Amino acid sequence: MKFIDLKDKDIAELQKMLKEKKSLLFEKRLQLKTMQLTNPSEIKVIRKDIARINTALSAKKD
């Protein structure tokens, strides 16, 4: 996911995406703790996606 893709979306859609990514992050962390996650770098990617969405949201609010 690139910031350019997020820039064109509206606030409601960004908030929906943020909620989905946060729930996905929770699931991946749970899998990590129970030793079911095969690729721990997925957590890093999801965290960066959340940061991009938050940046796009704050840019829209200004």
UniProtKB/Swiss-Prot annotation:
GO terms for cellular component: ribonucleoprotein complex; ribosome. CDD domains: Ribosomal_L29_HIP (cd00427). One of its GO terms (biological process) is translation. It holds the Pfam family Ribosomal_L29. Keywords: Ribonucleoprotein, Ribosomal protein. It comes from the Bacteria. Gene3D superfamilies: 1.10.287.310. GO terms for molecular function: structural constituent of ribosome. HAMAP family: Ribosomal_uL29 (MF_00374). Belongs to the universal ribosomal protein uL29 family. This is Large ribosomal subunit protein uL29. The gene is rpmC.
